[in-house]
Amino acid sequence: MSPVNKNYPPRARKKLVKRKVHNKELSDHFDWIRDNNWQEVLHSPSVLKKNIRKYIDEENRWTNKKLSFLKPIEKDIFREIKKKIKEEDTSIPQKDGNWFYYSETKRNKEYSILRRYKSYSSRKKSCIYHDWNKESKPYKYFKPGGAFNSNNHSLLAWSFDSKGSEFYEIKVKDLNNKKQLKDSIKNTDGRIVWSLNNEGFYYIKMDKNHRPSSLYFHLLGTHQDEDIEIYNEKDSGYFLNISETLSKKYLVLNIHNHETSEVRIINQEEKNKKLKLITKRKKSIEYSIEHDQENSRLLILTNKDNAIDFKLMETNENKLSKKNWTDFLPYREGTLITNFSCLAQYIIVQELENGLPRIVVINKKNNKKNIIKFDEEIYDLDFNEGYEYESNKIKIYYSSMATPLLTYDYKLKDQKKRIIKKQQIPTGHNEKNYNLKRVYAISHDGEKIPISIIKRKDTPKNAPTLLYGYGSYGISISPSFSVSRLSLIDRGMVYAIAHIRGGMEKGKKWYENGKKKNKLNSFKDFITCAEFLKKENISKNITIHGGSAGGLLIGASLNISPDTFHCAVAEVPFVDVLNTIL
């Protein structure tokens, strides 16, 4: 495994392994690099086989040596980015019952501090109820999970990963006396839902393959071994997650893969913990639910009836069968519904149309709609309904590739918004110094591929460019603000996002046409975008960047068209696809 020439990277030794899959013989010379006990490695990296560790260390040493000349500028850029981040900051307080909750970051503190104050008091009288920095001290590695206050606001369940394995442990704290309870729940996905009576909580347990596979209930004061298993998913291709309706009446168990879903609910107002099925899973049919308490109905977001970009349906909460579902917000092709929420008086719907997001507010009394839009050519938009079902306002989060995050308070009745927080850049920032642009490249089959571009107004033509792409799992890449990106753009680079097929920027068809047998479209779209930027004299010397499934995109693009690109960054690339899946 030693390099033949010190100017070349270490060469992994070859050891042929053959196996048959679907009557085809597959050959792999590097099978030995994949440790068979990877589940143990996730829990404890030190058990990685010595020959694999040796090769990884050799690669890292060679890389560090070759890139050592970049250390000075790396340090400069790190300091530069750090100066642009406001080290001491606070989030917007969110009301939950008789309390307001918020977080703060402090200088030289790695993690946030969680604070709260009584609703009739003021922020000046707030108290710390959870300090992630304090909790991290006993561990060499620490990653915060979530913090979930009980319905009576007396208890806090919090989760963390102390090994880097993404198996989260859950602990419980008494918020009245600040003492930790003995409860300790291991191997979870990090999220919980409290029971209404605060006597315990629901959680998802991960199996040895890191799959969230089982729903449990934990009664406070008992050992994890005594926890009740409520549901176990036998199909290894499906995953579980839990949430609760904003009304808090129902715990929601979502069972899903990347294209099919099934929902089961528990009525939290009843003593038994019996799961009730909404409708059985059916291949390629997805749905999710919310509860409308005033109208005793469930609202259902689904792609049923060939509504590939989704529609909103409704059914009486006591008549769950699919035959009782009726359209509430009918299907409109080309308008993708990405999210929705139900409050006491309003339904909030988030949509994506022509690659741009918008928020639609529906008055439940008369079904009148109000559309919230913004004026920039490209931007990112999101909303948060808060913790309270009875709320008459929402938070709106807006940013663009040039505009730092703006938080709006939006009054649903008055249809008025006001800025309540602006993301501060301590070194200063003027969005007017930048040009934003949405352009379209024509791919091999005539499809128009959107490209979001930002550059300084004084950047000349044919500038060096970083082109980013992902194009997998239906994930849309938002043209949002990034502090670190400024260090490239302010040095004269163009930054571009290729919204290729495999994402969902132009609806569900956009996703379907970039997966499985259509996956080649993702790669061709990406190469087309790079060629377009050169042809239009926007770019020269294009560096491409993608991570995980986006790393597959980078690897494939380099192999198909190596001369198109100047440099490539494949971050944790998922490039051994068939071996992994098969």
Residue ranges and their predicted role:
Residues 1-393, 399-405, 409-413, 430, ...:
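Beta-propeller folds
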Residues 551:
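Residues forming the Rossmann-fold NAD(P)(H) cofactor-binding site
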Residues 189, 286, 539, 564-566:
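Core-facing hydrophobic residues within beta-strands of well-ordered domains
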